[in-house]
């Protein structure tokens, strides 16, 4: 005799609510868009000359030589889910110049795409002294822009039919949910140039690894280390970016060994697994930290003192950059520069020739 379910309609509804509460916004998005083409935006930013363009080209499987990104560049990728199906589109933005051009975040982060937006932060592991400032400055600028856009939408009463709630809400079982401050949109932190990083002193590697694990967990982000010289790590990074760009299945492999490239999907780590900051060179008791985030920052910058790079001054003059050469325009510009120099010399001579009476 078949078993008859004793669940009432109320029991079934309650179970459905519990099921939905346990899912992340990204998982809900994947279910909602399973049968419809999507358009998502992925915003790449990070360390100057940190390998963002290389990672982006590898993701798009383009056999091109990476060129320095002058300011802000746009491209796109498409992916078919099956035979004779509309292709999903990923709008891909890349911010160049490190922290010097952070004001440009307002261009790729708009009311039209904020509900479909995710961020990839690329940090150069070979330059740990600039790592914290780069992370804090760029994520701060991006967060402020997202919050500004969301506030404007709420003020005008507009509603966007998006896949994810913004700011996103972590499910109730997310590790340490009450102790972290999740980034308002999905975030992937990529540690680049692992091939150089792996030659660092083991204690310094441990400090960097634990700190980035804490930061990724604090922001509710995924974390992966990669190297352009390792196809294995580049393939893993593609999987993480694919999930953001096209809603593919979340990578499940986890690696927390500091001697190997880290790979930690969001929600797979916890404060208890990460442990306290590495303090072999620091007496934590002497540090006056306001909160755990501030403590990790103080410990990290004791080991890797902040170096002011003045990136704004380091930016190359695009007029002299061969990447943007225009022979005809450049020759006219050179002629005008010569005329200006000659005019300045003549004016200087005329002032010197003046006999000014006392």
Curated annotation (Swiss-Prot):
Entry-linked InterPro entries: DYNC2LI1, Dynein_light_int_chain, P-loop_NTPase
Annotated spans, Disordered: 1-35, 307-358
GO terms classed as biological process: intraciliary retrograde transport; intraciliary transport; intraciliary transport involved in cilium assembly
SUPFAM superfamilies listed in its UniProt record: P-loop containing nucleoside triphosphate hydrolases (SSF52540)
Assembly mode: Light intermediate chain of the cytoplasmic dynein complex 2, a multisubunit complex composed at least of eleven different proteins. The cytoplasmic dynein 2 complex consists of two catalytic heavy chains (HCs) and a number of non-catalytic subunits presented by intermediate chains (ICs), light intermediate chains (LICs) and light chains (LCs).
Composition skew (Basic and acidic residues), residue ranges: 307-320, 333-349
Any one of the GO CC terms: cytoplasmic dynein complex
Pfam family name, one: DLIC
Family: Belongs to the dynein light intermediate chain family.
UniProt keyword annotation of Calcium present: no
Molecular function terms from GO: dynein heavy chain binding
The name this protein goes by in its record: Cytoplasmic dynein 2 light intermediate chain 1
Function: Acts as one of several non-catalytic accessory components of the cytoplasmic dynein 2 complex (dynein-2 complex), a motor protein complex that drives the movement of cargos along microtubules within cilia and flagella in concert with the intraflagellar transport (IFT) system, facilitating the assembly of these organelles.
Taxon lineage: Eukaryota, Metazoa, Chordata, Craniata, Vertebrata
Biased composition (Acidic residues): 24-33
Broad class of where this protein is predominantly found: cytoplasm
Compartment(s): Cytoplasm; Cell projection, Cilium; Cytoplasm, Cytoskeleton, Cilium basal body; Cytoplasm, Cytoskeleton, Cilium axoneme
Keyword entries, A-Z: Cell projection, Cilium, Cilium biogenesis/degradation, Cytoplasm, Cytoskeleton, Developmental protein, Dynein, Microtubule, Motor protein
